[in-house]
């Protein structure tokens, strides 16, 4: 939606880079060799563990004359708003929706097809569980989330999808359907394996130790599926590499548990970081703290 707005107002197609919070500083460093006129950071929350590096990269970009707009809905980003202001970074923040809500309300009217892009942004809101929709919208949101999460969906596919939205104004195509089917098959296989790795299940929630399983980017979806099936808080702990252990948490609608408030302090105590939202959060700690992380998470589920 934001790219479409820029294309109409500036006549340009911005370059798209995809980054997770814990590697945002590396992505920003890539821009320093050939600084653009404007950088828009969208839906990337602040990871407290790498915030000093992100802050330095932002400062370096601003010093080179780059204007920066940060659009987000994660509380960790709002908490550094004064720092961002001092750096000269503009923050567009919402606590009542998500980044897609801002895209729908602010940027969709600036495109050459406000109706299409408002609908596209609504799909993002549905995917982030801050809005509901009719059967068509729910289907489209489900297929897009599945396709984007397929094991073979790399940055190239994601960039192609964005270009399709901007140039063809189509929500999905045959490739989306194929990748969505791939995702469902991969998720079913991993779920069967994961259910053998539940190390704790109590009245409030369950804890999975999947450090010896390659999850291929499916951890959040596995936690979401378990939370929905069991009606409990679901925390999946896994190792994306030899250096780190990650815990991703999903909270069902009727559970009283703030995922980011509970998990972030644990990670900080163990020399890590992370963030997220009240019902969906992820933190990472050094691999040497994996056992301690499991212990602390189990304690959090039994309080």
Q: In which residue ranges do the predicted regions lie?
A:
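Short, basic, glycine/proline-bearing loop/turn elements
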Residues: 12, 38-45, 202-212
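A structural-propensity feature for long, helix-poor, extended segments
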Residues: 28-48
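Active-site cofactor/cluster-binding pocket
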Residues: 44-85
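Hydrophobic anchor at the start of a short beta-strand
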Residues: 13-15, 67-68, 233-234
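Short acidic, S/G/P-rich loop/turn micro-motifs used as interaction or catalytic elements
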Residues: 22-24, 45-50, 213-215
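A structured phosphate/pyrophosphate-recognition subdomain
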Residues: 3, 7, 37, 69-70, ...
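Anionic-ligand anchoring segments at beta-strand to alpha-helix junctions in alpha/beta enzyme folds, i.e.
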Residues: 1-35
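Glycine-rich, acidic loop segments that terminate in or are immediately followed by a histidine
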Residues: 135, 206-303
């Amino acid at each position: 939606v934001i790219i479409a707005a820029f294309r109409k107002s500036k006549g340009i197609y911005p370059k798209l880079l995809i980054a997770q919070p814990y590697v945002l500083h590396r992505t920003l460093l890539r821009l320093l060799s050939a600084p653009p006129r404007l950088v828009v950071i969208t839906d990337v929350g602040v990871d407290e563990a790498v915030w000093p590096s992100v802050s330095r990269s932002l400062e370096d970009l601003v010093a080179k004359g780059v204007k920066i707009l940060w659009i987000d809905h994660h509380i960790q980003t709002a908490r550094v708003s004064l720092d961002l202001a001092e750096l000269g970074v503009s923050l567009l923040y919402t606590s009542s929706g998500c980044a897609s809500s801002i895209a729908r309300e602010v940027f969709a009217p600036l495109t050459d097809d406000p109706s299409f892009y408002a609908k596209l942004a609504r799909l993002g809101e549905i995917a982030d569980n801050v809005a509901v929709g009719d059967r068509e919208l729910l289907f489209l949101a489900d297929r897009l989330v599945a396709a984007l999460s397929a094991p073979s969906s790399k940055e190239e596919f994601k960039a192609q999808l964005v270009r399709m939205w901007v140039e063809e104004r189509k929500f999905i195509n045959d490739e989306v359907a194929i990748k969505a089917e791939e995702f469902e098959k991969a998720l079913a296989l991993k779920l069967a394996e994961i259910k053998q790795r539940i190390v704790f299940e109590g009245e409030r929630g369950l804890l999975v130790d999947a450090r010896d399983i390659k999850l291929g980017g499916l951890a959040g979806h596995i936690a979401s599926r378990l939370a929905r099936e069991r009606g409990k808080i679901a925390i999946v702990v896994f190792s994306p590499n030899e250096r780190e252990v990650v815990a991703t948490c999903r909270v069902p609608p009727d559970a009283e548990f703030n995922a980011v408030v509970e998990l972030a302090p644990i990670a900080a105590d163990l020399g890590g970081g992370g963030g997220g939202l009240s019902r969906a959060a992820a933190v990472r700690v050094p691999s040497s703290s994996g056992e301690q992380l499991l212990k602390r998470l189990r304690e959090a589920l039994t309080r």
